[in-house]
Amino acid sequence: MRVAILVLLMVSFSPAGHALGGEDPEEIPTVVLEDILGTYSRSVQIAFERVSDIDSYEEAELALVDSWLVVTGIPIEEHRWTAAEPEDSEPVEHLRGSYIWTFEDSTKGLEQLRSSFLKGEIESFSPLLDRSVSTRFEPNDPFYDDQWHLNNTGQTSGTSGEDANVTAVWNSYNGSGVVISVIDDGVEHSHPDLTTNYLSQHSYDWCGDDPDPDPNSWDGHGTAVAGVAAGTGNNSIGVTGAAFGADIAGHRLIACGFTDSTAADALSYDNGDIDIYSNSWGPFDDGNRLEGPGPITVAAIEDSIYNGRSGLGNIYTWAAGNGLEANDNSNYDGYASLRYAIAVAAITHYGDQSWYSEPGANILVTAHSNGGTPDYEGITTTDITGTGGYSGGDVTHDFGGTSSATPLVSGVIALILESNPDLTWRDVQNILVHSSRKNDANDSSWSVNGGGLTVSHKYGFGAVDAGAA
């Protein structure tokens, strides 16, 4: 049950306020032509853009407001003599040039502020309102508390908050309406934590040439991947996925050898209905080979990029590779290095590089997986039921590699697409670039690129952050 809590929006003030009054000055207020808003951080600017949209408020609501947040270059001692004529002005401590203006007659505040704005006396004005908030959604799945990659509270001795920040958006989005294709060694679609989200009509077994991608009992990789991305949440069973409301298509491809033609078919299957193709596989990570997709596969992916999703383009996520100890580099992987692919590296519950995660210029983002001390702290996700897969039960606590980081990114993308289904494949990459968080901030691999963005060959543009996206 959501619990509604009424809180008062608090703004931090400096100790010295100013009561305004006195005789009228002989001259009009000193208008300072300065772009004060432009000196604020981009995040603060976006917040101002949101709250200053007066049309987004109800008229009756605004009529009761007696305190407003105002940005102006006019000296505080002259605020009283602006067209707005506030009764009082208080400077905001952390925002130079911002003030809280108070009006004795709340019904006239908006009209007077508009007049002041039109005269060029103020840059921005927005009402200070009481806000209602709710507690964050938390799934009732029994192993959710073990899923530190979704909500890191320090339960594995890692760094609290070092996670994908999906809980920040779960009250609004869970991936509903988005289809993730898991290209792997199969998906156990009868698994109680997967069956609800499984779409048989968009699935296929390329090894057996039939519509059922059910895996061999020893092939638990794809089932684990599916659980990380879109395991059913809040069903009192097992685990939850990052996008627990998204749909899953299963494609059994890597359980056998496959041709260029077969890979092309799998990676473009039903590209009008499938949104994301999640790929936790690639060439052997031995540091000795340069391999990539054949021409048929490249052509199929290009067609999906330009024509899939009704012309918006399909999204391809790809594991960057686990060969760091063999001095492998993700640049050697032609699949993960495709310009259309979102190459994903792995970090631990501390936010640093997992011991196996390959670096590369191709890496776009990083996401959480195993590899942290003291016990490598694996990812909790779905496993083949019974004695098959990685454990003797329906859940494994030891999944990992960039194989686990990749579906976590796929899940975050599903949340993004639910919020805006009209995003193109390039839009999605752009959002990830600008919303990812600089993890392991003191690492020497970070540098500023030609576009002024901070980037690393270990981490790409940083750790995915669903809340920021």
Label every PLM stretch briefly.
Residues G22-P139:
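Inhibitory N-terminal propeptides of secreted protease zymogens
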Residues V44-A47, Y99-I100, S124-P127, V179-I183, ...:
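Structural recognition of the beta-strand scaffold that forms the well-ordered cores
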Residues G158, N165-T167, V178-I180, D185-H189, ...:
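Subtilisin-like peptidase catalytic core
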Residues D270, I274-S280, G313-N314, A341, ...:
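C-terminal subdomain of the subtilisin-like protease fold in secreted/lumenal serine endopeptidases
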